[in-house]
């Protein structure tokens, strides 16, 4: 969930390098979809919170745990691009048995993993 469509679109497209797929006005809201990779089946719907209860969950939709996992085929390219765009990382990149990973927070404080499998 997001608090403002335009602010969320700006963050996901400018900071994370996502592409805006759809932005369709509806009654009092918008259908806003972004994708990390145009042409892929992976999309993210940016839904604006519509009441106080939902607003309370913005940034804590997974109770402080990693919420989403962004897989890449070139970790260092994407990590460096995101860093230069001002994305805030909560730790240094590390090597795990499954690959290279780093945790970052989006503009709302939701935690994400950027990772590349060893096989990639």
Segments (PLM) and residue ranges:
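Vicinal oxygen chelate
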Residues: 19-71, 79-107, 115-120
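Conserved active-site tyrosine of GNAT-family acetyltransferases
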Residues: 8-13, 82, 109
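Conserved phosphate-binding and hydrolysis motifs of nucleotide-dependent enzymes
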Residues: 4, 106-109
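Conserved beta-strand-loop-alpha-helix junction that forms the acyl-donor binding cleft
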Residues: 1-5, 27
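Helix N-cap motif at beta-to-alpha junctions
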Residues: 4-5, 73-76
